[in-house]
């Protein structure tokens, strides 16, 4: 099985969204800046020295800026896969639609989004060898 390892939510105002989730749930945020697409890493629970959740089954996530040229902007999950190309093939064969080509996220792995058969926006990531072994970026 391939586990859900991350969640993502779009934002119009990252400062406002970070403040909301910090105040409401105590989540912590790390702003990555323009060189990483103004992505915000979100920690939802205590993590170990490798930035992995200490609570089994728990996941962290991120916020990304909404953009007029990207129509699929709503909360989604990220599934870890061993072989992103093989998973892309399986998605297409099962009736889903892969959105573009995988992009490399430095230190993390290959990432791509897709629509399932019900139109849900989901993403998947093939982690780097370092991430698979418990290392972090």
Task: Map each language-model feature to its residues.
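Exposed loop/turn and edge beta-strand positions of beta-sandwich/beta-sheet ligand-binding modules
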Residues: 3, 57, 108
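Conserved beta-strand in the GNAT
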Residues: 61-63, 122-123
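Core segments of cupin and vicinal oxygen chelate
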Residues: 8-57
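Short acidic/glycine-enriched loop/turn segments that link adjacent beta-strands
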Residues: 35-39, 71-73, 105-110
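N-terminal beta-strand motif that seeds the catalytic metal site of vicinal oxygen chelate
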Residues: 1-24, 74-77, 126-137
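Vicinal oxygen chelate
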Residues: 4-12, 30-32, 64-137
């Amino acid at each position: 099985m391939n586990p859900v390892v991350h969640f993502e939510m779009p934002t119009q105002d990252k400062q406002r969204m970070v403040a909301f989730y910090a105040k409401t749930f105590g989540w912590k945020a790390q702003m990555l800046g323009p060189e990483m697409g103004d992505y915000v890493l979100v920690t939802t629970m205590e993590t170990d020295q490798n930035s992995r959740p200490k609570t089994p089954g728990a996941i962290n996530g991120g916020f990304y800026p909404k953009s007029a040229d990207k129509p699929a902007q709503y909360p989604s999950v990220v599934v870890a896969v061993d072989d992103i190309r093989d998973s892309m093939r399986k998605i297409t064969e099962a009736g889903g639609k892969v959105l573009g080509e995988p992009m490399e996220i430095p230190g993390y792995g290959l990432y791509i989004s897709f629509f399932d058969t019900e139109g849900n926006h989901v993403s998947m990531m093939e982690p780097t060898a370092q991430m698979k072994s418990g290392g972090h970026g």
